[in-house]
């Protein structure tokens, strides 16, 4: 089954409408297609790329996808579009995350770390405070990834080394430092322990470093821990829907992976108030490894 469940629209910083992205998925021959727009951010997270479009436009995004689903409901020759979300992991705002997830009938939730604190990890001009600060940021990034995986709020951990995007060389230097891979392994183990699927993304192939997310060292850890994976394009343009999936499929197979596991919830998270209550208790407390059954 050829699936791409991590895509974006012009609701945020994508370039095309939900309908245009869907038609690109049909043209690409996808069997399963999902639209997973960025979740709205608190005002403190002033990312100029997309925060200005929210929260008002998110409702329109949901309506657009639901209209697409209704239109395609009787079509057996085309994939049924799914409503997903890329949830920004905001550990200082647990109620913001939980409240948002109760508002919409998502089929799946992708968890992402685009920030460490208020630091936007994808912006090159912000990585100017030296090696020691960068190494501390990498450590915090993977500590929070483990916490996200154990929270019970997400189905998928997306682009697991996205933090390398604007600091590629420095990130790989850090990975070679003693103890770094052990810290990453803690995050990967949290995925395995809590049934969170790891995304293998072709988006990194479109960056100057031309390396998938995640890098080989992390793929090896995922294979060792038996984490399930799914493939994704993280397309922000219709030309990238399904792009590079064949390449990352070969990459994943080289580590012994299959990728027929899909990150779909049997029911919407808002029907599971106990999960949200557990998540709030967990996020408001210290950092023990709690496990929540979805």
PLM feature segments, named:
Residues 18-27, 59-66, 95-98, 139-146, ...:
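Amphipathic, non-transmembrane alpha-helical secondary structure
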Residues 90, 118, 266-270:
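A short acidic, often aromatic-flanked loop/helix-cap motif at beta-alpha or helix-coil junctions
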Residues 1-91, 100-101, 166, 171-178, ...:
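An N-terminally biased module of ancient metal coordination in phosphate/nucleic-acid-related enzymes
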Residues 34, 110, 158, 261-263:
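Residues embedded in well-ordered beta-strands within globular domains across many folds
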Residues 31-32, 107, 155, 258:
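Short acidic/polar active-site loop segments enriched in Thr and Asp
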Residues 92-97, 120-123:
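Short, conserved acidic/polar surface loops in the N-terminal third of protein domains
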Residues 1-9, 18, 29, 170-294:
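Charged catalytic cores and adjacent phosphate/nucleic-acid-binding surfaces used
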Residues 11, 106, 111-225:
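Domain-core and long-helix interface of multi-subunit machines
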């Amino acid at each position: 089954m050829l699936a791409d469940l991590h895509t974006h629209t012009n609701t945020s910083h994508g370039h095309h409408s939900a309908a245009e992205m869907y038609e690109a998925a049909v043209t690409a021959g996808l069997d399963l297609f999902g639209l997973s727009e960025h979740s709205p951010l608190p005002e403190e997270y002033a990312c100029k790329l997309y925060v200005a479009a929210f929260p008002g436009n998110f409702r329109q995004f949901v309506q657009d996808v639901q209209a697409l689903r209704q239109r395609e409901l009787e079509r057996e020759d085309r994939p049924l579009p799914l409503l997903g979300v890329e949830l920004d992991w905001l550990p200082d705002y647990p109620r913001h995350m939980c409240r948002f997830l109760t508002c919409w009938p998502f089929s799946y939730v992708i968890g992402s770390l685009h920030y460490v604190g208020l630091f936007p990890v994808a912006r090159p001009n912000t990585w100017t405070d030296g090696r020691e600060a960068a190494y501390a940021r990498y450590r915090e990034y993977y500590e929070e990834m483990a916490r996200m995986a154990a929270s019970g709020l997400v189905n998928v951990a997306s682009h697991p080394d996205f933090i390398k995007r604007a600091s590629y060389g420095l990130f790989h230097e850090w990975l070679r430092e003693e103890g770094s891979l052990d810290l990453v392994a803690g995050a990967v183990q949290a995925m395995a322990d809590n049934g969170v699927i790891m995304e293998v993304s072709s988006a990194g192939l479109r960056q100057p470093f031309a390396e998938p997310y995640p890098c080989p060292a992390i793929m090896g850890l995922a294979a060792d821990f038996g984490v399930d994976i799914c493939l994704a394009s993280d397309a922000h343009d219709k030309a990238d829907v399904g792009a590079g999936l064949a390449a990352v499929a070969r990459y994943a197979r080289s580590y012994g992976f299959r990728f027929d596991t899909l990150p779909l919830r049997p029911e919407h998270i808002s029907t599971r108030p106990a999960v949200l209550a557990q998540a709030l208790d967990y996020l408001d407390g210290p950092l023990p490894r709690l496990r929540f059954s979805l």
